[in-house]
Amino acid sequence: MRRQPLDRKETRMISQRCREAAWCWAAVWLLLFALAAARAAVPPKIPLKAEPFRLNQVRLLDGPFKHAMELDHKYLLSLDVDRLLHCFRVNAGLPSSAKPLGGWEEPKSEVRGHSLGHFLSACAMMYASTGDEALKAKVDRAVAGLAECQAKIGNGYLSAFPESFIDRVESLQPVWAPWYTIHKIYAGLVDVYVLCGNRQALEVVTKACDWVKARCDKLSDEQMEKMLGNEHGGMNEVLAEVHALTGEEKYLKLAQRFNHRAVLDPLAKREDRLTGLHANTQFPKILGAGRQYELTGREDLRAIATFFWDVVTKERSYVTGGNSDGEVFSPKERLSKHLGPTTTETCNTYNMLKITRRIFGWEPKAEYADYYERALYNHILASQNPETGMVLYYLPLKSGVPKVFGTPNDSFWCCTGTGMENHAKYGDSIYFHEGDKVLYVNLFIASELTWAERGLKLRQETRYPDEDRSRLRFACEKPVEMSLRLRHPYWAASGFEVAINGQTQAIASRPGSFISLDRAWRDGDTVDIRMTMTLRTEAFRDDPKKLAILHGPLVLCAGIEPGRPTAAIVSGEGEIVSHIRPVPEKPLTFIASPKVFRVTGPQAGRELTLIPLFRQYKKPYIVYWDVLGEAQWNATLAEIEAEAARQKALDAQTVDRVVIGDGPSEQAHALAGEKTGAGPHQERHWRHAVDGGWFSYQMKVLDGQPMKLLCRYWGSDSGPRVFDILIDGKKIATQRLNNNRPDQFYDEVYPIHAELTKGKSKITVRFQAHPGNMAGGVFDCRVLKSE
C-alpha cells in the first residue's frame, strides 16, 4: 500500500522536534568541519564539481546498513590495542606482554602490521560516523604507541617488521609486500589526523615520510620502477595526501616517484593490459593517480582513472560489481569461464568504490552512482555475516560454494582490514553537493544529513530495498533555495515517480540520470520517490547463455544444500522471469519454478527460493545459470553420469594417490623440494616449483610391473612452465604447459616401465623445473595400474 503523505501541520511538528535535537549537535560538528578544512594546507588545482559530505554530517537510521555498521562498531571496540601494537613494539626493541594476534598478523607474517593501519582508519571513520569517544580514545592510544616505537628506532622508520624487508624489496629479493603494509599504516595515521584531529598522528606520518624520502633518494628512477613490481599499495596516494596536509612539495614529488609506469602509462594511452595482473595491486595506483590529478591538474592522470574505471566496470566485472578470479584479472573475452570459489576479492570492490567516489566528484554522472549502488549492495553489504559481523575474503560465484567468513583474532586477511573500513563509512557517498546550490541524493539509505552551512537538515526515511520508495523530509529555520538532484536508477525503467508535499510532479526523466527539483525548500517539505523494481536478467558479454537474476539493483541467489551442483535454466516458452513468482508477505523473496530452474543434487526437482545475495550467508548458493534446451540438459546429465563412472574406474585403477595441497597426504608421501609452494584454484589445490626449483613425492608401486603416472593440470596455465618428470632420478617425460586446454582441467598419463619398479615397493616422483621456469601446477598425482 502506498504511504499517505502527512499533512502540513503534522510535518512541521515532527520537523521542529528533529531540529531541536539536532542543531546543538550540528554546531559542534560544524566547528570540527572548519578545523578539518583548515588542515588542508594545499587547495586542489582541480576543484570538485560534486563534494561529498563529511561522515560526521550524516547519521544512519535503522536499516541493513546501520545494522552492519553497528556490528563493525562492536568489533572495533573489541580489538585490543596492545595486541595490535605487539609486533611494532617487538620490532622497535620495546617490551610487550601482549598475546600476539594470529593469521596475517602472527609474528612471522611478512605483512604483520597492516591491520593496525586499517584499524586506525576504521576507528577514525566510525568515530566520525557515530561520535563515540571510546573509539577516539583507542586510536589516540594506538598513535601514542606508534610514536613511541618510531622514537625508539630513531630514523623515522615505522613498521612491525624490520627495515631489512625494505632492503630486500629494493634489491628485488623475495619478500611479500612491505610497501603495501607501510601504506596501510600511513593511511591510518592520515585518517586519524583528518577525522579525529590527532596532531601526533600527523607528526608521526611526516617523520615516516621523511624516512621514505631518504630511502628513495638513493634509488635511480630505473631502480624505483623495478622495485614497484612488488605490491606497494597506495604509496603514491598517501604521500600526495601528506603533501596536501603539510604543503611540503617534497612529498608530492616523492608520490610521483611511486607512480608505477609499467601499469599507468598504458592506461594513460587507453590501452588495457590488465589481463593476468594481480588485481588488487593495481587499484591503489589508480587512486593515487586520481589524487595527484586533483593536486596538479595533469590531465593524463585523470585519463588513467577514468579509462581504468570504464574498463573494469564495463568489461571486467561480474553482476555483483566485483571483479577478478583467484585475485587476477581474467581475460575479459572469457570472463564467463572464470567462476570459481575465489572470485571477486572484497578488497577490489572496496577500492573500486573509492575510485568511483573520486571520479563522481570530478563529473557527477548517474552511471557512477549506479555502479556504486550495485557494488555496495551486492558485494560490500554481502561481505559481512549479519549475525557475527565477521567479513569474507572472496565472494564466490561458482555454484554450490558458500561464503567463508573470518574470525575475530586469527584471520586478519587484507579483506579483514578493508572490511573494518567498509562498514564504518556507509554515510560517505549518500549525499553530495555542488557549492551551496545543489544537493545530490545518490543512494536510498535511511539517514539524516545535517548541512549546517545552509541551516538545513534532511531526513531520508526508507525501508529500501524491501520497499521501492523513499521519503525526504526537510527541516530548516528559513527557506533554502537550491536544486535537489535525485538519481533515477538505471534499472528503474518501468516507473520513477516523484511527489512534493503529496503532489505528483510532471518530470522528464530517463533511467540512469539525475532529475532536478529547483525551488525554495521550506521547513516540513517532503519529497516522496517511488522506483518500480522488476525482475530481469543480466548475461555475460562473452556468453549470452550464462546469466544472473536481479530484482531492481539486487542480485538474487538460490540457496542450496552442500555439494557441487550443475545449475541451468531449461528455457521453455515465455520470458525467463515469468517462471519466478514473489512470496506474499516476504519482501525480496521469490520462488523459481523447478520445471525451468533445474539443479542436480539433493534439490533436484524441488522449488528453489531466490533471495538477495546480501541476505544469503548460511548456505551454498547459485548466482549464475546456464540457459539450455531440453536436449542440452539431458546431455549434461549424461556427461555427469559418465564423469562419475570415469572417476570410479580411475579410483579402481589407482595404486597410490597424493592429494595435492593436503598437508597430511603430502607428508605421508614424504614431500620434499626447493622453491615450491601450493595454493587453491577452482576448488582444487596445486603445487608448483618456481625458478628452477623442484618437488617430489614417494609413491607406492607394484614390484616389477609396468605402471602409469597420471598428473592433472589446469589447461590455461602458460608462461615459462617447462619441467622434467623423473622416477628415482631417471627422466620419463618433459612437460610444457602453454595454454594446452583453455579453461578446463585435463590429465596427462606417462608410462612407467617395469625396470623402474623392479624390486621396489615405492618410487620417488620428482618434478624438476627447467632453469628460469616453473614446474606445475600439478593438481592431482596418481600411480595407476598399467591395465
Language model regions located:
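Beta-strand-rich ligand-recognition modules
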Residues: 503-524, 530-544, 678-708, 712-786
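Bacterial N-terminal signal peptides
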Residues: 24-36
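Hydrophobic, small-residue-rich alpha-helical packing segments that form membrane-like cores
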Residues: 204-286, 291-295
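C-terminal beta-rich recognition modules with glycine/proline-rich loops and embedded aromatic residues
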Residues: 305, 370-378, 383-475, 510, ...
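Short, Lys/Arg-enriched N-terminal segments with co-localized hydrophobic residues
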Residues: 3-12
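Bacterial Sec-dependent signal peptides at the C-terminal "C-region" and cleavage site
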Residues: 34-44
